[in-house]
């Protein structure tokens, strides 16, 4: 789901030099709202397993998708989170390995997100009844994890780094918000 103001992403998908099956969708609704954009993308997904990955992130290994699919399909769980790491130099070096773990305090205070960012998530598409809350910004991932846990129970923890996240600052999304805005979002969630 593409909310950009230009055609760069659409052109890339059309050129598709990698022979990938890409379902391109131009989303003009709620421009700039990551939750609404992700929900729009979820609505057009057709696969048995859906792997969310955001445009700043990429697969760490060539078999990341296969490993994700196999682990989820061979479980009785609805969703899965995988390990991740960070890169600050376009994939030349990697640091900050994260192996997600559930933490009941994630929505209590800043710094308690032990699951990591949104690109670690995969889920079974059939009967998926959870969507992202458009009123969240910095906590949208944590809020989604809690919603998934409440509806479907614990996820599969795939203890392997399969996704790399491009970061400039580990808190880059939430750091653009004032302390008051962050506190209001914690209260809301």
Question: Which residues does each predicted region cover?
Answer:
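Short, high-confidence coil segments that cap the C-terminus of an alpha-helix
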Residues: 47, 75-78, 152-153
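Conserved nucleotide-sugar donor-binding catalytic segment
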Residues: 82, 99-181, 185
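Glycine-rich, basic loop-to-helix element that forms the pyrophosphate-binding segment
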Residues: 28-45
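Conserved donor NDP-sugar-binding/catalytic core segment of glycosyltransferases
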Residues: 58, 63-94
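Short beta-strand-to-loop acidic/aromatic patch adjacent to the donor-nucleotide binding site
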Residues: 47-58
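Short, solvent-exposed loop/turn segments at secondary-structure junctions
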Residues: 5, 30, 56-58, 85-87, ...
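Acidic donor-binding segment of Leloir-type glycosyltransferases
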Residues: 1-26
């Amino acid at each position: 789901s593409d909310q950009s103001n230009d055609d760069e992403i659409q052109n890339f998908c059309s050129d598709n030099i990698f022979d990938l099956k890409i379902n391109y969708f131009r989303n003009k609704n709620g421009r700039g709202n990551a939750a609404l954009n992700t929900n729009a993308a979820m609505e057009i997904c057709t696969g048995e397993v859906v792997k969310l990955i955001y445009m700043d992130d990429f697969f760490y290994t060539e078999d990341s998708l296969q490993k994700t699919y196999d682990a989820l399909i061979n479980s009785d769980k609805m969703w899965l989170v995988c390990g991740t790491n960070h890169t600050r130099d376009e994939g030349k070096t990697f640091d900050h390995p994260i192996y997600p773990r559930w933490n009941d305090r994630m929505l209590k205070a800043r710094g308690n997100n032990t699951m990591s960012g949104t690109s670690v998530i995969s889920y079974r598409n059939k009967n998926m009844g959870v969507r992202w809350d458009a009123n969240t910004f910095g906590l949208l991932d944590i809020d989604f994890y809690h919603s998934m846990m409440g509806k479907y129970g614990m996820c599969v923890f795939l203890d392997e780094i399969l996704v790399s996240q491009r970061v400039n600052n580990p808190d880059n999304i939430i750091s653009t918000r004032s302390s008051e805005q962050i506190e209001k979002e914690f209260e809301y969630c």
